[in-house]
Amino acid sequence: MSDTRRRVKVYTLNEDRQWDDRGTGHVSSTYVEELKGMSLLVRAESDGSLLLESKINPNTAYQKQQDTLIVWSEAENYDLALSFQEKAGCDEIWEKICQVQGKDPSVEVTQDLIDESEEERFEEMPETSHLIDLPTCELNKLEEIADLVTSVLSSPIRREKLALALENEGYIKKLLQLFQACENLENTEGLHHLYEIIRGILFLNKATLFEVMFSDECIMDVVGCLEYDPALAQPKRHREFLTKTAKFKEVIPITDSELRQKIHQTYRVQYIQDIILPTPSVFEENFLSTLTSFIFFNKVEIVSMLQEDEKFLSEVFAQLTDEATDDDKRRELVNFFKEFCAFSQTLQPQNRDAFFKTLAKLGILPALEIVMGMDDLQVRSAATDIFSYLVEFSPSMVREFVMQEAQQSDDDILLINVVIEQMICDTDPELGGAVQLMGLLRTLIDPENMLATTNKTEKSEFLNFFYNHCMHVLTAPLLTNTSEDKCEKDFFLKHYRYSWSFICTPSHSHSHSTPSSSISQDNIVGSNKNNTICPDNYQTAQLLALILELLTFCVEHHTYHIKNYIMNKDLLRRVLVLMNSKHTFLALCALRFMRRIIGLKDEFYNRYITKGNLFEPVINALLDNGTRYNLLNSAVIELFEFIRVEDIKSLTAHIVENFYKALESIEYVQTFKGLKTKYEQEKDRQNQKLNSVPSILRSNRFRRDAKALEEDEEMWFNEDEEEEGKAVVAPVEKPKPEDDFPDNYEKFMETKKAKESEDKENLPKRTSPGGFKFTFSHSASAANGTNSKSVVAQIPPATSNGSSSKTTNLPTSVTATKGSLVGLVDYPDDEEEDEEEESSPRKRPRLGS
C-alpha cells in the first residue's frame, strides 16, 4: 500500500458542478464477484475502508485528462474522478480500463458520448462517416471552418468527432498561425471568424484540447483571438492587460519552474473564464464544466505544492513579522497569504484542515495580530480577510489561541481586542469593515459552534475569558456615549485613537435651580432631549447599532454571563438613553435589546426592569412619536402586546400602576386596555384567595402581606442609611441565595450614586447619567403643564404649608423641592422626614391625569 504510483484522490461532482473530495487512498483493479466483473477499488490510506467500488462497464465512457486524471459518469448525474499522484499509476489503470473495453490505451476517451436520440441517428449514418473531414486550414476557408464548429455544438456525437479531428491533425496550432497572419494583414473579417472558431472549440469542453490551447506556446494567441468579438466596435485589449498591467509578484522567489508555470496558467485560464468569455446561457452552462474542473485541479495542485514547501512558507512568515520589513513588502506578503487562503477554498474539508493546521503551526495568528494593528489600510483589510477564512473554517482554533495568549499578554494586545478595536476604529463612513468584523466576533462567541468534551467545556472557558478580558472593550463606546463622565470619555478617546462627534453634549449644570413650587419645562417627560447625551453623529450611531446587535445576540445565547454584566453595568438603562437618538434605527436597536431581555420571561430581569423603572424611556419615546404610524410606534406596541399575550404579571402590574394614565388615551390598539384588564383580573384573583383564608391567618401577626414586607424593606434601608450615612440602592431587594443578582451590584450602585450626588445638591436628581424620570409634583398647575405628553403623578402633600414636602423611601423616591424624581437612590438628608412617610396613604405613587 506504500506504492505511490497507485495513490489517488477520489472526487465526485456535486449539484453546483464543483468537485467534492471523497478521500485519499490506493487504487487497484480486481475482479469482484458481487459485481460480476473487473472493478476499480480504492481503499482509504488512513484506515483501509472502501472509498470506491466501481465496476468497469464496457459501455461507460472513460476520459483521461492532464495525464493524471481519469473521469467518468456512473449515472445521469453522478460523475467520478480519480486524481493520481503519479502519471505512471494513471497509465497503468487506464490500460486496465481499455483492456476491459477492448480499446487502444493511446486514446483519451474510450467511448463516444451519445444520448438516445443521437443513437438512432448514429445507427442510420454510413460507416464511412466516423470522422469529420476538416477543411484545409487557409484564410479563405475560415468562414467554412467557423460554420462547421458552430454547427456541431448541438450534437454530442459530432462534438466528440470534431474534437478528435482537431486533436489528431494538430489543427489548433495551424489556426493560431492564421490568427497571426490575419492580425498582421488587419483582416478584420478573418479575425471575427477566428473568434467564433476558438470560442466554439472551448465549448467542445475537451480537456485534451484545453491542454494544447492553454500551453505557454498557445495561450496568448488564444486570448488574442477572443479579443475580436464581432459584437464589439473595437477589439478588447486583453493581451495588453495580461502582459503589462497584471504583474506576477514573487514575494519570495519560487524556484520550482513547474509551480511557477502552473500559477501563470491558472491565472490566465481564470481570466478567460471570468472576463473574456460571456456569461453562458442556461443552454450553455454545462459546455464549460471541463474548464471549471481544469481550473479547480490546478488550484488544488498549487496549494499542495506550496503547502509541502515548508521552507518557502517559513520564509514568508519570518519576513511578515520582521520589524525591518518595509511597508510595501509587507503589503505584498499579506496579499499573497490572502490569495493563498482564497485558493485553499477549493480544497475539501479534510485537506483544508491540514492546510490551516500547517498555517497555525507556522504562526499565522500571531502574525495577523501584528499586521491587523498596522496603520496601512490595505494591509489591515487583507489581514481581516485572512482572519475571516480562519474563523469560518475553525473558530475553535482561534478561541484556543486567544485563551492561551491571555495567560501571557495584557488585555490591550489580545487578538480579539485588536479585532474589536479595528471594528470601533473603522474609518469607512458606511463601516463596511466593521460589519465584517462584527460577523466574525459573532461567530467566535456563538455557543452553537463551541465544543464540549469530557475533560473541559469550551463554552464556559471561552465565555469566562471573553467577559473578563474583552467585553469592556466592546461596550466602551456604548458606555461612553451614554455617560456624563467626561473623564471616562477622554480616557476612551485617548486609549483607542479615534474621534467621534458628540452632537448632544451632557448638561452638567442648569442656569437656574428649580423652585419647590414649580417644575422646569426641561424636566417634564417628553421635553428632555437636550438633557440627554445622544450620539447623533451618523457614523457613531452605526457603530453603536453594531455593538447593540452583538449584545442582543449575547442576551439570547449567553444566559448568566450577560445577565451579570447587564446588572453590574446597569447596562439596560444606559442602552435606553439611545431611545433619544435622532436616528430611528439606533432607537430601534435599543428597543430590540430590551425586547430580547423581556422575551426571555426571566423574573430576575423583570425585577431589574421594574425596580429601575426602565419602561419610562420607552413610553417617553412612544409619546414623543405622537400620532406618527411608523416602525418605532409598531415596535413599542409589539413590546407591550408581548407582555399582555404572555401574561407577564410583574411587568403588567408595574406598567398599569405607574403608566396607565399616560397610555389610556391610546385606543387605536387594545393593548393597553388589555393590560389593564389582565391586571384587574389578577388583582381580583388575589383578593378572592385572601378572602378564602380564615381571618386569623390574614392578621399581620401570622401573615406578612406585601405592604408589611415593603415597610420592613424600607426599615432595613433606613437602618443602613443611619449606620453608614451613604446613598444606597433603595428599591432592590437584598439578594437571596436563590437569586442570581451579582454580589457587587449594590456596592457598584452605591459608589456610583454617591459620587453623582456630590455635584448635584441643587440640581434635579436623575437616576443615572443620561437617565430621566416621570416628574412628580404637589402642584396641580405642574400636573397640567404645557407639554401635553408629560406624565405627572399626583402625591398628596405631607404637610399643609409645604415646609417639609419631601417623601423618602418609596419604591420611587419623590423630591418635590428638587423638581425631579430619583429612582434608585435615597439621600441621607432625607432621613429626618421618615415619620412623614409613614403617614403617607400610598407606598407607590399613582399617575395623575
From Swiss-Prot:
Quote the tissue specificity entry. Moderately expressed in tissues and specific brain regions examined.
Every WH1 domain range: 1-100
Keyword terms: Cytoplasm, Cytoskeleton, Nucleus, Phosphoprotein
Bias (Polar residues) occurs at 776-818
- One Gene Ontology cellular component annotation held by this UniProt entry: centrosome
Function, please?
Regulatory subunit of serine/threonine-protein phosphatase 4 (PP4). May regulate the activity of PPP4C at centrosomal microtubule organizing centers.
Protein name, per record: Serine/threonine-protein phosphatase 4 regulatory subunit 3B
User: From which source organism is this entry?
Assistant: Homo sapiens
Source organism lineage?
A: Eukaryota, Metazoa, Chordata, Craniata, Vertebrata
